[in-house]
């Protein structure tokens, strides 16, 4: 990807997710929301292997670093794709993260964090590619660890979902996590969004 293309893609992140010209059917909206609720449940109950099965082989899981800018530099609010990021993962690196999370030697998560993933404001768009959807959703992730450590992460996820015969109806092909915080005060980012 050229620098110009990366800059354009990054500038698109600050734009609101466009509403579809035609709303999707209530049935499809319901299916997508139910998928997200089940995904949140898997994460909150530390069922990481089942969650990993929801990721497509060509997954791109990306959380760009957000910076605070003045209005005229708003298009530079996110660090460009291909540069540093909180997460910039593919299927293999996500497998490594899951392996680490489920290991008994994972000190960052021993004892386990208690999390609650809340997903709302789900906007679904159909695409020209069959069985593929673009979805935006708002999230709030609450984490309590040890006795007094509390972290709250808020933001927007922009996903590409593909139809799948996996009992939940979809798999995640792309996830871009647009976190609201420019400075993350948590001790670590050992949670999935």
From Swiss-Prot:
InterPro entries linked: NTF2-like_dom_sf, Rng_hydr_dOase-bsu
The UniProt record lists the keyword Ribosomal protein: no
Pathway note: Xenobiotic degradation; biphenyl degradation; 2-hydroxy-2,4-pentadienoate and benzoate from biphenyl: step 1/4
EC number in record: 1.14.12.18
Keywords: Aromatic hydrocarbons catabolism, Dioxygenase, NAD, Oxidoreductase
The reaction(s) this protein catalyses: biphenyl + NADH + O2 + H(+) = (2R,3S)-3-phenylcyclohexa-3,5-diene-1,2-diol + NAD(+)
Residues annotated as transmembrane: none
Alphabetical GO biological process terms: 3-phenylpropionate catabolic process
Gene3D superfamilies from the UniProt entry: 3.10.450.50
Keyword Hydrolase tagged: no
One Gene Ontology molecular-function label: biphenyl 2,3-dioxygenase activity
Uppermost EC category: oxidoreductase
Top-level taxon of the source organism: Bacteria
Functional note: The beta subunit may be responsible for the substrate specificity of the enzyme.
Quaternary structure and interacting proteins, as annotated: Heterohexamer consisting of 3 BphA1 subunits and 3 BphA2 subunits. A ferredoxin (BphA3) and a ferredoxin reductase (BphA4) must be present to obtain activity.
UniProt-listed NCBIfam families: PRK10069.1
Family named by the database record: Belongs to the bacterial ring-hydroxylating dioxygenase beta subunit family.
Protein name: Biphenyl dioxygenase subunit beta
């Amino acid at each position: 990807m050229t620098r110009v293309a990366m800059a354009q893609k990054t500038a698109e992140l600050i734009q609101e997710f466009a509403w579809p010209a035609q709303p999707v059917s209530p049935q499809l909206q319901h299916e997508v929301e139910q998928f997200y609720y089940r995904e949140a449940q898997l994460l909150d109950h530390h069922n990481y292997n089942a969650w990993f099965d929801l990721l497509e082989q060509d997954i791109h899981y990306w959380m760009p670093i957000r910076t605070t800018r003045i209005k005229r530099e708003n298009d530079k609010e996110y660090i460009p794709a291909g540069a540093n990021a909180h997460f910039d993962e593919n299927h293999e690196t996500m497998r490594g993260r899951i392996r680490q999370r489920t290991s008994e030697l994972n000190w960052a998560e021993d004892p386990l964090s208690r999390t609650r993933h809340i997903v709302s404001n789900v906007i679904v768009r159909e695409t020209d590619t069959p069985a593929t959807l673009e979805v935006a959703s708002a999230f709030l992730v609450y984490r309590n660890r040890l006795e007094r450590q509390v972290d709250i992460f808020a933001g927007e996820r922009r996903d590409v979902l593909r139809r799948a015969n996996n009992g939940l109806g979809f798999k995640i092909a792309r996830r871009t996590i647009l976190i609201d915080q420019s400075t993350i005060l948590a001790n670590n980012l050992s949670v999935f969004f």
